[in-house]
Amino acid sequence: MPESSISPSADPRDVESIDAIITAAYESISGPAGAKRNWHRERSLYYPGARLIPTGSPAEPHALAPNVLDVDGFIARVEPYFAEQGFYEKEIARRTEQFGRIAHVWSTYESRHKPDDPEPFMRGINSIHLFHDGSRWWIVNIYWQQENAEHAIPEKYL
């Protein structure tokens, strides 16, 4: 699928601050099984050409490698899963560094199938790069790795 060079217009409240855009990113992918996500909202958060980069290997969990996706590639990857499974992801800790119009956020997350599940089925860390164009924040890329037995989340990220 060809990559769009133009992102849809965003709700100004979603992109007015780093807090707002991170919240919108988590909210846009969360919902019950079978519920259509607001992909317009999701796309509106990302700078044209942005990348979403999960680190892992479904076949071999110990052979980690980045899987570089554009926004539409990410949506195509997760839609079948979201059709069958509830997915609620929320941020549980954050470290932010900013210089001028660029920012880096370490965002620790946990995922549940239902919002009231007592324990998450997954946790991990997102490395999020952001850019402010003078009027709004954009996500340039999100690069993440799930926690596993070999790679527990360090205390400094909790």
Q: At which residue positions do the language-model features occur?
A:
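Short beta-strand edge/turn micro-motifs at domain boundaries
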Residues: P2, D116, R123-I153
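Short beta-strand segments enriched in hydrophobic/aromatic residues
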Residues: I29, Y46, Y109-S111, Y143-Q146
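Extended, well-structured beta-strand/loop surface patches
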Residues: A103, K114-P120, I153-P154, L158
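Short structured motifs
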Residues: P8, E89-A93, I125
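Surface-exposed, charged secondary-structure patches
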Residues: R51-L52, G56-D116
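Short, low-complexity N-terminal intrinsically disordered segments enriched in polar/charged residues
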Residues: M1-L45, L158
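Hydrophobic pocket/interface hotspot
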Residues: A25, E42, A50, V105, ...
